[in-house]
Amino acid sequence: MEILDMTVEQLRNAILDKHLKSEDIVKAYFDNIKRNEPEINAYITLCEDYALKEAKDVDKKIANGDKVGRLAGIPIAIKDNICTDGIKTTCASKMLYDFVPPYDATVIKKLKAEDAIIIGKVNMDEFAMGSSTENSAFKITKNPRDITRVPGGSSGGSAAVVAAKMAPISLGSDTGGSIRQPAAFCGVVGLKPTYGLVSRFGLIAFASSLDQIGPLGKTVKDCAELLEVISGEDELDNTSSKKHEKEDYLEGIDDGIKGMKIGMPKEFLNDGLDPEIRKCIDDTIEKLKSLGAEVCEMSLPITEEGLSAYYIISSAEASSNLARFDGIRYGYRPDDFEDVYDLMETSRSEAFGDEVKRRIMLGTYALSSGYYDAYYKRALKLKKKIKNEFKEAFENYDLILSPVSPVLPFKIGEKKADPLQMYLADIYTVNINLAGIPAISLPCSVSKEGLPIGLQLLGPHFGEKKIFRAARALEKER
C-alpha cells in the first residue's frame, strides 16, 4: 500500500514494525505537498526542516528500543489559529501576519508528548469567520475534489490537506460548523467534540462559548485516535470539563448499532435541502435500519431559530475577543499615525478583512445600550432553550441524524458577495455549537457531478463513543 493511502493505525504499525521509517513518511508527504500545494493553496506555513528533524529523532528512539508515543512519526497539519511555539500563527489575517507564539496550545503539547510531527499550518477563513476559506488574507484554498469549488470553512485548509493526501490527519476548530462543513465538502471525516472535552488554551478565540478544537482524518478510527490524544481536563482552560473521565474511543468502535434508536428531525428535511443530499439522507436511513438500528422521525422546532441566535452570540463574543488587536500590544501596526487613537483606528481598518469587520460591527451593535436586551439577551435565552431541547431529545434517542449543509460544495466566488446566503449554509451545524453537544461529519455519497456529500451524527454531551460506533458502522458499508 502507498504511504499516502495509509491510515494512522497502518502508519503506526509500519513504523513500530520497522517496515517504514518516520523520515520516509514525512518525505512522502512533503513530496506530495510540493506537487499539489501550488494548485490547492492549503498551507500558510510549511515546517519541512523541523518535521524531518523530529522524524529522525523518532526513528532513533525506535532503533534504540526506547518507548515512543501513540502517534510516533505521524505527520499532522494544524489550523493556523492554534498556537505553536516558534511557528508562525496568523489566523489567516494581516493583523497577525508575522505573529510567532512563545508557547504551545495545550493540544499541541499533547501531540508532541505522543511524538506526532507537525508538518505545517493550514489556511482558514480569517479569525475562523466564514464558510468557504475565501476570507483568508493570504490565499483562497481550493477543493481537491473540484478545484473550481470551495473546500468549505472555516477549517477549509484542514479538510483540504487530508483530502489531497497532503497530511494524514489534521486539527481544526469548530464554532458553528467549521470542522464538519469542510469535512463534508472535501469528503473526509471531521468531529466537533463536546464543548469542554478538548482544551481551548492556545486557540485564538473567535467566540469563546462556542469554539472547540477537533480532529479531521481519512477514517472514523483516525479521528477517534486523535481525539483520545487531545482530549482531557486542562487547568489552563477553566471551561474544560473536570467531571468527565478520559475514554478509550477505539474500544467497542466496531460493535455495530443494533438496538440503537436514532432520530431524524423533520425540520432538517425542508425545501431548502438539495435533492441529492436528501436522497443521501434517505438512503442512510435505510442503511441504518438494515444494520439493526431503529430510525424515527422526530421534531426539534426551536432549532429553526438557531441561526439568528448563533450569529448574534458569536458576533458579540468576537467583538469582545478581537478588541485586543489594536496595534499597540501586538499585531499589525501602520507606519504612519498621528496619535494613539489614529494608531488603533488605522491598525484595525487596514488589517481586518471585510467579514471580520462586518461581524465586529454586528456584535458591537448587539451589545450596545438599548439593543442588548432585544438582541444579545434574547439570543442567550434561545441558546438555553436549544440546549434543553436537545437534552430532552437524547432522553429518547441515542443519536440524531442530520445533513451537514443544505447545499453541495459551491463555486469559488459564488456566494462571496452575498453574506446572507453564506450564513444560511450553516443552518444545520450551528445548533450543535449552541447546545455544546458533539457531532461527526462523515462521507455519505457523491453527487452526479462527483462532489462529496456528507452527513452528520449528533450525540448527547460526552456521547463521542456512541457517535464513533455508529459512524464506523456506516463507514464499513460504503
Swiss-Prot record:
Catalytic activity: L-glutamyl-tRNA(Gln) + L-glutamine + ATP + H2O = L-glutaminyl-tRNA(Gln) + L-glutamate + ADP + phosphate + H(+)
Catalytic-site annotation from UniProt: 79, 154, 178
InterPro entries assigned: Amidase, Amidase_CS, Amidase_dom, AS_sf, GatA
GO CC terms of this entry: glutamyl-tRNA(Gln) amidotransferase complex
UniProt key word Metal-binding: no
Lineage top rank: taxon: Bacteria
GO biological process, one term: translation
A GO molecular-function descriptor: ATP binding
S-S bridge residues: none
This protein's record includes keyword ATP-binding: yes
One Pfam family cited in the UniProt record for this chain: Amidase
Enzyme class: ligase
EC number: 6.3.5.7
Alphabetically ordered keywords of this record: ATP-binding, Ligase, Nucleotide-binding, Protein biosynthesis
Leader sequence segment: none
Family: Belongs to the amidase family. GatA subfamily.
Record text on subunit structure and interactions: Heterotrimer of A, B and C subunits.
Functional description taken from the UniProt entry: Allows the formation of correctly charged Gln-tRNA(Gln) through the transamidation of misacylated Glu-tRNA(Gln) in organisms which lack glutaminyl-tRNA synthetase. The reaction takes place in the presence of glutamine and ATP through an activated gamma-phospho-Glu-tRNA(Gln).
Protein name: Glutamyl-tRNA(Gln) amidotransferase subunit A 2
